[in-house]
């Protein structure tokens, strides 16, 4: 089975083109566990399957290293857009990608036939507790206390098609990240678990972020997480609506025009291609 390794700011993925490769859908979760293993597999933060779609140019399904399926991934969708365009599978600089969170529309900045930057319409944020989903009374979750592991965190909950728990801190380096991340991810308040973002506000136009991804652990970047962080920053009065998000391996630029969709801009890179032993 042929695959391509790609990343968006170090958030890395294995892409399998199911237009060409025959893969049994029942095998998707197990393949993700095996292929994403960094010691015994290819190594990645997720396995991305490209499939035909009746309503878009392509359908994208993404599975975490633990075999669970994610609704959406902003860094992965940029990698998918680059893959499709540079192989001539799409001709336009706007692509429709079907995900479990809906149809997303990446726009490509192309120079000399190469995709240099991808801007993605990530849709509208969902803010009601039931839409996250999160246990508790109706309404938004803004700066609400959440107790776990003997500590209390002030959280803001945002869904970008997948759940995010955003926490603003004074000093990102002082956060007990490896302890707090998994405790919050699996907290009973989140019936489908959650992604966790710790945010340090530098200025209203700049923030630093560390992310603990549901089903993957700490990753170097998270596109939907960066979007959720800026939405939370606006709602709490910490940031403006055009924000640069500093991540471990680089920056994403997030825009949230008032009352409208969230837009994410960032790079995507291919690393290598290879063959993985698989039989249907």
Swiss-Prot record:
It catalyses: (2S,6S)-2,6-diaminopimelate = meso-2,6-diaminopimelate. One of its GO terms (cellular component) is cytosol. The active site is at residues 73, 222. Its EC number is 5.1.1.7. The keyword Isomerase applies. SUPFAM superfamilies: Diaminopimelate epimerase-like (SSF54506). One of its GO terms (biological process) is lysine biosynthetic process via diaminopimelate. Substrate binds at residues 11, 64, 74-75, 162, 195, 213-214, 223-224. This is Diaminopimelate epimerase. It comes from Pelotomaculum thermopropionicum (strain DSM 13744 / JCM 10971 / SI). The lineage of its organism: Bacteria, Bacillati, Bacillota, Clostridia, Eubacteriales.
């Amino acid at each position: 089975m042929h695959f391509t390794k790609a990343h968006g700011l170090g958030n890395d993925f294995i892409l399998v083109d199911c237009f060409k490769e025959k893969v049994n859908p029942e095998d998707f979760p197990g393949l993700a566990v095996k292929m994403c293993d960094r010691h015994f597999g290819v190594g990645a933060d997720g396995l991305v399957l490209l499939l035909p779609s009746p309503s878009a140019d392509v359908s994208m399904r993404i599975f975490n290293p633990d075999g669970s399926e994610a609704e959406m991934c902003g860094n992965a969708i940029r990698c998918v857009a680059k893959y499709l365009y540079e192989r001539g599978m799409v001709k336009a600089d706007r692509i429709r990608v079907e995900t479990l969170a809906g149809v997303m529309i990446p726009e490509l900045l192309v120079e000399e036939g190469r995709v240099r930057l991808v801007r993605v319409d990530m849709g509208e944020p969902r803010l009601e507790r039931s839409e996250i989903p999160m246990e508790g009374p109706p309404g938004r979750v803004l700066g609400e206390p959440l107790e776990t592991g003997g500590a209390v965190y002030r959280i803001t909950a945002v869904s970008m098609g997948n759940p995010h728990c955003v926490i603003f801190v004074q000093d990102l380096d002082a956060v007990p990240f490896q302890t707090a991340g998994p405790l919050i991810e699996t907290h009973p308040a989140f019936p489908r678990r959650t992604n966790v973002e710790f945010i340090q506000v530098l200025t209203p136009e700049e923030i630093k972020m560390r992310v603990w991804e549901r089903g993957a652990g700490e990753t170097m970047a998270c596109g939907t997480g960066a979007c959720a962080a800026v939405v939370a920053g606006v709602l709490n009065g910490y940031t403006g609506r055009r924000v640069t998000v500093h991540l471990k391996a680089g920056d994403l630029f997030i825009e949230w025009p008032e009352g409208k969709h969230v837009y994410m801009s960032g790079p995507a890179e291919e690393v290598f291609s290879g063959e993985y032993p698989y039989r249907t």
